[in-house]
């Protein structure tokens, strides 16, 4: 091989090594590593059996999650139950959050740049006695989306930390949702008032019980496909006298689930509902298990519905 090319290749190699070394040095100076991956929520992880409250402060709202009877509840919304998925994601964030780099103290301009100003999320964890375990201000994601800028209470420096931190930004988004989600294909009968639309099989159209008429109930079935809560009250805090007489709907599925919905309405497009679950004489094992594990989510609770869903169900009729 020509020695000239070997010399050129050698020079290029030296240059490459030099610039690579300079790049690593600059990174180490600008963002020196620190703590070796120490957990951000160390005290929280050490007190998992003694947690009491989690506070999530967002630019839009403050949400307090209180642990009662081993279940997390959203204090701002009737003390109703928080969603399993949301809580699981939150605790995964606690477990995954580790210090990656220390960036040093930040100026006011840096705080805005890193999202550690009014746009930040603040997470506070407390034990059962109310003592603060961890308080962390979480800002923007870094350019690679692998880390977030953060400030840890008691520290002046800004850190890069690992973790997802895609928190729900409203209290309602923390609730166990949806209240009800029934596919139209699963519904065997729908009773509204004194009339019942029923079918023996999915391929057969609905008929009004005792008649040959084919009712149009598709909009009711579609509304039952996703029923969500936008506010929640305990039975003792819900004044039924403030509403018109409720509309009663009973839905029965092919696998034996029976859902009775009482829908309350009043002026201003405000609709609330209560839900009760039972079974037919021969339900499937899955239905029995569902009722046993989920009945507490509905017993003595009233739920505010979205106006469009509430309007459809409150004005439902079969003819």
PLM ranges: what are they?
Residues 1-319:
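Secondary-structure "cap/kink" motif recognition
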């Amino acid at each position: 091989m020509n020695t000239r090319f070997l010399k050129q290749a050698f020079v290029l190699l030296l240059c490459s090594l030099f610039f690579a070394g300079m790049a690593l040095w600059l990174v180490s100076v600008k963002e020196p590593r620190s703590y070796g991956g120490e957990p951000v929520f160390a005290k929280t992880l050490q007190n998992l059996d003694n947690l009491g409250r989690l506070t999530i402060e967002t630019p839009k709202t403050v949400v307090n999650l209180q642990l009662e009877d081993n279940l997390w509840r959203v204090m701002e919304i009737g003390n109703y139950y928080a969603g399993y998925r949301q809580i699981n994601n939150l605790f995964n964030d606690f477990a995954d959050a580790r210090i990656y780099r220390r960036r040093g103290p930040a100026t006011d301009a840096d705080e805005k740049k890193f999202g550690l100003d009014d746009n930040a999320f603040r997470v506070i964890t407390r034990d059962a006695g109310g003592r603060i375990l961890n308080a962390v201000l979480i800002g923007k994601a870094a350019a690679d989306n692998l880390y977030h800028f953060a400030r840890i209470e008691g520290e002046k420096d800004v850190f890069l930390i690992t973790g997802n931190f895609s928190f729900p930004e409203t209290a309602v988004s923390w609730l166990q949702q949806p209240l009800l989600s029934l596919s139209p294909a699963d519904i065997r009968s729908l009773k509204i008032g004194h009339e019942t639309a029923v079918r023996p099989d999915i391929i057969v159209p609905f008929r009004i019980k005792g008649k040959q008429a084919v009712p149009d109930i598709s909009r009711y079935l579609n509304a039952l496909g996703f029923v969500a809560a936008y506010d929640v009250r305990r039975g003792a805090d819900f004044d039924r006298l403030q509403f018109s007489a409720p509309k009663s709907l009973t839905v029965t599925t092919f696998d034996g689930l029976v859902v009775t919905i009482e829908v309350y309405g009043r002026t201003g497009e405000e609709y609330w509902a209560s839900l009760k679950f039972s079974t037919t004489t021969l339900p499937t094992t899955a239905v029995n298990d569902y009722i046993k594990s989920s009945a507490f989510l509905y017993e003595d609770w009233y739920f505010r519905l979205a106006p469009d869903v509430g309007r459809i169900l409150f004005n439902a009729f079969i003819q």
